């Protein structure tokens, strides 16, 4: 929304992390939404950074009206080429902001620096989007002249904000995760992608903001054990489930006060989960149709899970 009205910002470095259908009820179309996001690159002075896996981001960079001397810097999950950041033997490597980058590279961090962000602190369970975000953060920092040791320390010390893939409890070997900030299909797909097949009880739904969630449901179907559906319009989730995951059972929370909704969704999720599973509140939708905010939605979820932990204990 801010980029829509922005005209005079001149960033040192910039990046568009993702583009997925969101806020279409405000922007009117995905094309208009993409055009507003692309403005993040306008007037960039030094580095227009983009994910090599994103054709949309590459197009934004190619078409951006940047300042003279601005370079395109790519992010890769593989060995980086010149003017790229990438991964080599478990290390984040800079081949963009180093002397003689045609033959030199600089390790700026280790993937081990991100282990505390993985479920259970296990590096092998680290969600792929966290690695992508770390590459982006490292590139932005290096563009601003930050030294490698400081990049590494920053990643080690980083603590996610509230309601962002927070494990709030483990009860009877079932992890309960608050990702209430996951209000888009893209965010929820990333949150569920690293889980094993048939191991997730997904709490989903709410105000879809004009987005079609069919592709999301198709993507995450293999990991689902069951779905608890929130929202005034549960069909945003139930109709794609019927089409792409008819084998996955679901329940509908229905209507009530925010506290009643939280109590019901936690009880329904608990009835589905089995030992080793993960119950994750990652709605892919805004909260406004039933809650004051995603914060309230996540807080009430965590409170109900804590109450259940006390009962079980």
Regions found by a protein language model. Give the residues of each.
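Short, glycine/charged-enriched secondary-structure capping and boundary segments
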Residues: 8-13, 29-32, 62-66, 87-89, ...
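A short, aliphatic-rich alpha-helical micro-motif
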Residues: 8, 41-42, 221, 273
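ATP-dependent carboxylate-amine ligase
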Residues: 140-149, 153-163, 167-313
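Glycine-rich, charged/polar anion/phosphate-binding loops
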Residues: 1, 122, 185-189
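Short, charged low-complexity linear motifs
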Residues: 8-22, 275-287
């Amino acid at each position: 929304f801010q980029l829509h009205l922005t005209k005079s910002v001149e960033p040192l470095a910039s990046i568009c992390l993702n583009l997925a259908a969101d806020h279409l009820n405000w922007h009117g179309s995905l094309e208009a939404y993409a055009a507003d996001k692309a403005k993040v690159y306008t007037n960039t002075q030094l580095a227009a950074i983009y994910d090599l896996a994103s054709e949309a981001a590459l197009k934004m960079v190619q078409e951006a009206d940047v300042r003279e001397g601005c370079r395109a810097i790519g992010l890769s999950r593989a060995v980086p080429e010149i003017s790229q950041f990438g991964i080599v033997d478990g290390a984040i490597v800079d081949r963009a902001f180093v002397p003689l980058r045609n033959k030199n590279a600089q390790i700026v961090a280790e993937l081990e620096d991100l282990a505390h962000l993985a479920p259970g602190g296990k590096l092998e369970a680290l969600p792929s989007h966290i690695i992508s975000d770390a590459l982006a953060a490292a590139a932005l920092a290096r563009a601003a002249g930050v030294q490698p040791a400081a990049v590494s320390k920053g990643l080690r010390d980083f603590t996610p904000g509230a309601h962002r893939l927070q494990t709030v409890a483990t009860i009877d070997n079932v992890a309960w995760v608050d990702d209430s900030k996951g209000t888009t299909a893209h965010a929820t797909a990333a949150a569920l992608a690293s889980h094993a097949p048939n191991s997730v009880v997904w709490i989903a739904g709410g105000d879809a903001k004009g987005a079609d969630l069919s592709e999301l449901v198709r993507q995450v179907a293999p990991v689902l054990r069951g779905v608890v559906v929130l929202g005034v319009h549960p069909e945003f989730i139930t109709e794609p489930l019927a089409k792409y995951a008819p084998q996955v059972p679901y329940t509908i929370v229905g209507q009530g006060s925010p506290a009643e909704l939280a109590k019901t969704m936690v009880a329904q999720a608990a009835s589905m989960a089995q030992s080793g599973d993960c119950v994750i509140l990652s709605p892919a939708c805004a909260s406004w149709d039933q809650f004051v905010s995603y914060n309230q939605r996540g807080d009430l979820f965590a409170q109900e899970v804590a109450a259940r932990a006390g009962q079980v204990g």
